Amino acid sequence: MNLFTSTLILSLSMLTIPVLMSLSSIYKSTQYPYYVKTIISYAFFTSLIPTLIFINSGHEAILSNWHWMTIQTVKLSLNFKLDYFSMIFTPVALFVTWSIMEFSMWYMHSDPNMNRFFKYLLMFLITMMILVTANNLFQLFIGWEGVGIMSFLLIGWWYGRADANTAALQAILYNRIGDIGFILAMAWFLFNSNSWELQQIFMLDTNQNLLPLLGLLLAATGKSAQFGLHPWLPSAMEGPTPVSALLHSSTMVVAGIFLLIRFYPLIETNKTMQTLILCMGAITTLFTAICALTQNDIKKIIAFSTSSQLGLMMVTIGINQPHLAFLHICTHAFFKAMLFMCSGSIIHNLNDEQDIRKMGGLYNALPFTTTSLIVGSLALTGTPFLTGFYSKDLIIETANTSYTNAWALLMTLIATSLTAVYSTRILYYSVLGQPRHSTLILINENNPLLINSIKRLLIGSIFAGFIISLNITPMTIPQMTMPTHLKLTALIITLTGFILALEISLMTQNLKLSYPHNYHKFSNMLGYFPIIMHRLIPSTTLMMSQKFSSMLLDLTWMENILPKSISNFQASSSIMVSNQKGLIKLYFLSFLITLIITMLLFNFHA
């Protein structure tokens, strides 16, 4: 082991200290959250050492010292892959989590189980680190399932609320569907490559098989909330705001995209798979951007913006630019975590009010929070020289100059414009105008835990994109030459979105109330997806099951075959018996006459 590998293992090992602390008496003290926050900050500074060594030397490493188990001919070891993706992502995730932990100390200060909440957040981070650094599919699957179960526990943190329990169940069930794809892909690789090591899979799988990649796409669709398996993401807003910030910035939702980036050596030679990923991403980014336009819950708007950005990352992988998608993951983490923390500050100060229509004029009451919210929204829209610009602008330029599906490109450009629209809508309703909240609310943001945590991410939202993009290793992007109008496409589309949003907001401010249009209903009801998936299908299934059990099983077996058949037989027998009037001589005589006539006829014939 050299300095490069040992310092990274040290920084990851430091994260387990607070988990071990939970076995001691420190876990019950009020200082436990402070210890967790401090240790994560130390882990971040330690992780900078191997990252800087890697940027300087460019040497990747694989740690494979610990043999785990052998199943027939498959040898499983604890493998850590220290490449470009894991080395850049680790300090980003640690930095963002450090800020979120400090924010949580302010946001969750009155929660009786705050120490357990911090332990859960930390385990969420640890499982994501396992996923990022894994070099075999089994280890990656442990991290994959780990982020899934921790998201379930954290989304359903306020388990006394029915909505929180439903949201947690939604998250775990939709991810279960994705996990089926992951397990099928693992089984396929085991049967065909006889290995779960990533290098061996890439070397042996030269047939360009679509089946395992479809499994991985299903897994990524579930985890990264792509169209079809997306409803759990807005529902996850029922969890506490720090959970939303961590979930959407650097942990669970980017795990699906990260999985596809890990397997890009297989995807880059498979054009069918690239087209599928491109179309899935384009549909997701447009649909969720449309859904964000008419939401009134500030957290749900930001959640849909996450889903839209994840769709943009899928589009980037679809045009065969995994390094660009990874760059967008890293830059997106800073301003998305900050946007959630700003919304958490507003919600907390307005006595848990999340409706943007009941805010307004917050620039005077919460100057620092609203300034950060404005910077975060501008970074999200790709404003030049903020963090989002360095990845988003490159993605749009690369898509414009690629041989790609024109419809997918058009949908992506429209979604980029809509990003500016819903970002402007948040700012217009919450920051500008007259206050529409209660005048008796005591608003105070002068808490160092709140200010310092947002301040760090604010600096990251301004400078991180520049720093990370300076240290990108050579990748597959060609030297792009394009006309000026193509170069300015991303900026023009964003400006169009801003102008459109402001014009619509100003035009509709003094209009009389009218009945919502069908397009508004479609967007507001999330494309009727939850109603169809969560109401229509379960109620139809329940009704059919009820009919099947009561009409078929109960009536047929319980009534017609056993009890009812006996009673019917007895009833018909009694009717037959009771119909006899007792005229036995007449019956015998008629029988005898019939017999004699029959015999005479036979004899006559003979």
Curated annotation (Swiss-Prot):
It is a multi-pass membrane protein. The chain crosses the membrane at residues 3-23, 35-55, 87-107, 117-137, 140-160, 171-191, 211-233, 241-261, 273-293, 301-320, 325-347, 366-386, 402-422, 457-477, 488-508, 582-602. Its main location: mitochondrion. GO terms for molecular function: NADH dehydrogenase (ubiquinone) activity. It catalyses: a ubiquinone + NADH + 5 H(+)(in) = a ubiquinol + NAD(+) + 4 H(+)(out). One of its GO terms (cellular component) is mitochondrial inner membrane. It is an enzyme of class 7 (translocase). Its EC number is 7.1.1.2. One of its GO terms (biological process) is mitochondrial respiratory chain complex I assembly. Coiled coil: none annotated. It is found in: Mitochondrion inner membrane. Keywords: Electron transport, Membrane, Mitochondrion, Mitochondrion inner membrane, NAD, Respiratory chain, Translocase, Transmembrane, Transmembrane helix, Transport, Ubiquinone. Core subunit of respiratory chain NADH dehydrogenase (Complex I) which is composed of 45 different subunits. Core subunit of the mitochondrial membrane respiratory chain NADH dehydrogenase (Complex I) which catalyzes electron transfer from NADH through the respiratory chain, using ubiquinone as an electron acceptor. Essential for the catalytic activity and assembly of complex I. Belongs to the complex I subunit 5 family. This is NADH-ubiquinone oxidoreductase chain 5. It comes from Pseudosoriculus fumidus (Taiwanese brown-toothed shrew). The lineage of its organism: Eukaryota, Metazoa, Chordata, Craniata, Vertebrata. The gene is MT-ND5.
